[in-house]
């Protein structure tokens, strides 16, 4: 099957990541981790917004009541409605940003020198599963934690190098997860809050890059962006490689379905670390009609 890509957002993000379709606002949310920016894009009007954060941001997801939950270097924070267009996260103290709509507050703060936030995802129950990693990507330096809407944090995995893609099967009974240096896409049994029975769904062959972000479609298949692999792959629920989407960039980072009918696959990309010019690296690509995605829950806090 041949896929035709389009450039959704021409950009020069250092480390574009975390595409998320905000169904309530009918827009795409994505981030530049190293640029400390949260971006939004309305594909109908073409309107784009950008919000600067004062810390590296690993993920930004919509909240049920409006605003955003953000996975930041020093913890998880909340922006009120309008927060995507005004206000900054505080780099010191317990709060920051402007007054009024868009106010920022910490939901959970934990300063660990040398560590930063990475990918995150909202589970079917509205909790945030937030990953971390060390800047030097040291094995065992990262974590995956469940952050409840009230701010209660439970560390689920504490022996992680680069915590990355996380997603759930259509029935919510399986959780997929990537720790990128392992080259594996793993699957867990999921009971609504806890995971168990970790096993390998698939592995990326040496020379084909590293698995990064993922999304699960309505058929239960797992789409995985391959960092340094220049492609997105689709795996069936039994781990069979089903499709390969070649891309004009070496470092796709993550993917998510969006659009009114959730059939357009948005793909974020990175420029950081490249030694040769790749004009579209750092932009957001889209493949119209690539498949059928699942509605993504908003954070319940």
Model regions and ranges:
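Beta-rich, blade/repeat-based domains predominating
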Residues: 11-25, 54-72, 112-127, 157-174, ...
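A short beta-strand motif characteristic of beta-propeller blades
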Residues: 4-10, 46-52, 104-110, 152-158, ...
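Hydrophobic alpha-helical segments and helix pairs
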Residues: 102-158
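A short loop-to-beta-strand structural motif that recurs across blades of beta-propeller domains
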Residues: 37-39, 75-77, 142-145, 184-186, ...
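Conserved beta-strand positions in repeat-built beta-propeller and related beta-rich domains
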Residues: 23, 28-34, 63, 68-74, ...
């Amino acid at each position: 099957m041949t896929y035709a890509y389009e450039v959704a957002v021409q950009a020069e993000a250092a480390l574009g990541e975390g595409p998320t379709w905000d169904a309530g606002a009918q827009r795409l949310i994505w981030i530049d981790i190293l640029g400390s920016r949260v971006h939004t894009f309305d594909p109908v009007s073409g309107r784009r917004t950008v919000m600067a954060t004062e810390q590296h941001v690993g993920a930004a997801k919509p909240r049920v009541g409006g605003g955003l939950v953000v996975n930041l270097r020093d913890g998880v924070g909340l922006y009120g409605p309008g927060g995507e267009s005004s206000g900054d996260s505080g780099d010191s103290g317990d709060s920051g940003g402007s007054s009024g709509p868009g106010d920022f507050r910490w939901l959970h703060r934990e300063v660990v020198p040398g560590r930063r936030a990475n990918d995150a995802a909202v589970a079917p129950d509205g909790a945030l599963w937030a990953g971390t990693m060390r800047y030097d990507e040291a094995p065992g330096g990262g974590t995956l934690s469940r952050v409840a809407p009230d701010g209660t944090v439970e560390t689920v995995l504490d022996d992680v190098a680069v915590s990355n893609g996380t997603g759930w099967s259509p029935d919510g009974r399986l959780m997929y997860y990537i720790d990128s240096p392992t080259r594996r896409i793993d699957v867990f049994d999921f009971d609504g809050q806890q995971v168990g029975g970790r096993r390998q769904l698939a592995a990326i062959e040496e020379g084909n890059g590293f698995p990064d972000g993922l999304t699960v479609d309505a058929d239960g298949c797992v789409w995985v962006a391959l960092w340094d692999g220049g492609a997105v792959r689709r795996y069936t629920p039994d781990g069979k490689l089903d499709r390969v989407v070649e891309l004009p960039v070496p470092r796709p980072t993550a993917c998510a379905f969006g659009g009114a009918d959730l059939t357009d696959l948005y793909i974020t990309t990175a420029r950081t670390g490249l030694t040769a010019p790749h004009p579209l690296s750092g932009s957001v690509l889209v493949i119209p009609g690539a498949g059928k995605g699942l509605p993504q829950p908003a954070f319940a806090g």
